């Protein structure tokens, strides 16, 4: 018998057939429990913002400047300068961001972890991060990997003569992979049209995805599915960049600006390239893509398989990209690796070689570069940039800053001496508070007026929830601060019940106006604060109705944004297509409603227990959209009781679907057949899913009422303050 067969630990914890293998459709709650303190080596007392503020950023930048031109034999620098490599590293760190759910982006340093560290489009960026390790090692906890990756991209640009728009720190590292849906394909770079394709119909890309193929950051540089058609590629570019929050002008600026520097690598056939980092042997120490082609590095490097250098100035900011784009006619050719690319027809060899100063090459371009000339809208912008270099430089600086900071959320999170003073619309700006805040006595007075106004508990709670629950922990957008629920587009969202919302806001505005008018010394309450305070009053009244006296925590300090400070198109992506906490579905989806509930809970940074107690409380408070009775398992509505759990777990009730699609269910008395309740999948999952049922049993027990109220108040307060970065 072999030693392996004798080993008593061969089937240690974590090995063997998993629940997911047996029941692949089982609701997965694991995304609610990522990034716990158990995986964080920094300890609960570590505050990254405080550590970063003590950092000598100028010293870090000096070290980065020196690194740019200190070529290492184990991975030599193209043209003697690592700038192009580090721009790509920073771009690909930030470029996974997508607007649909706010996931991806540079904010957590996820490029260090699978799957991103092993995506084909990130080939050889493992070398870029290893080049940075001595600097990361030197400054330690004072600068995160997430911040360092972006800062390095900025310094790369600056070291090559480009003036950047600014840099903000504040991206704290996480210590395990984020669980993000990147697509259903099982093969890297799988083409569209297969059984797991992300495309349907007339090349309609699946939401929330933004990249065109599994393992790409943006688009296929050879063209759609490798078809070298610049016009068809432009359609992919426009769709993908829009899903990453970029308009046409920003898109042109980013492509042309980024491709002013460096080169691509396709010295030989891809068959020479070894396994990606996650599949490489343990002796590779986290490095991948080892190439057997000649030396495997420098002039022999293979990354994308394309062999393109765009400009005569690959280590210096210039406008040569547009000069070449419009100055030549282009003919299709193939790289040494066999990839489609384009070469300037009849051109002289004017492009420098990356390693041999005696050699020159003809200008080359990617299919997606030519899209900037042959797509009519892109061409118009490109020619304007060509004729107005200062406009191009400004547009690229702004687009680069947006690319690398889009997922950071509000300016309140920006740290460091290089934060630009200019406030940008895409940052969802909120005015600074310029008046004294209300105190506890004022809050009590306002709550009394709200409760005497005729507004119901359900109206108060549902309005506060609608305002606060737009928050996304992914890109830190949304939340109650700013009171944007009173502005377009939020005031018109179906989930926000526009007619009821308008009536509630009118009443609250009258209370606010009267209160502010009666103050001396400039004290005021913002509508944003009053919306949250009114919701707290509703929760307190509901607890009182259930026999419990509680005070819901409240922290004033929110301000009211204006319509002019709100980008309607950008804000539209926050509209809920599903909110299980309000038993709301905008339409029918392939994904079951309970999966959408867990997704919403994860964006709200909730744990499974928090999700459970919150939903059970909101049901009995009548927070459903349209006053739906689904899931309102109580005869004491607007009282904060644990009735939802008690009645869901009652074995005297038998549940059956009302239709074949099993989205809505009737609960009837087992003995008499009398209809007792109706519920949705989102309601019944708390009785059917074993882990959620275990949580429901905690809150449905005879001794649970006080704990239920206490836990509900805690998670309510958490959601109301998710966007209060000023309180951190």
From Swiss-Prot:
Residues in cross-link Tryptophyl-tyrosyl-methioninium (Tyr-Met) (with W-91): 218-244
GO molecular function, one term: heme binding
Protein modification: Formation of the three residue Trp-Tyr-Met cross-link is important for the catalase, but not the peroxidase activity of the enzyme.
Residues joined by cross-link Tryptophyl-tyrosyl-methioninium (Trp-Tyr) (with M-244): 91-218
Gene3D superfamilies linked to this entry: 1.10.520.10, Peroxidase, domain 2
Keyword set includes Nuclease: no
SUPFAM superfamilies assigned to the protein according to its UniProt record, in alphabetical order: Heme-dependent peroxidases (SSF48113)
Active site residues per record: 92
Site (Transition state stabilizer): 88
A GO CC term attached to the entry: cytosol
Residues given in the record as heme b binding sites: 259
Cofactor detail note: Binds 1 heme b (iron(II)-protoporphyrin IX) group per subunit.
Tagged with keyword Cell inner membrane: no
Family statement drawn from the similarity comment of this UniProt entry: Belongs to the peroxidase family. Peroxidase/catalase subfamily.
Function: Bifunctional enzyme with both catalase and broad-spectrum peroxidase activity. Also displays NADH oxidase, isoniazid hydrazine lyase and isonicotinoyl-NAD synthase activities.
Name listed for the protein in its UniProt record: Catalase-peroxidase
Species of the source: Burkholderia pseudomallei (strain K96243)
Lineage: Bacteria, Pseudomonadati, Pseudomonadota, Betaproteobacteria, Burkholderiales
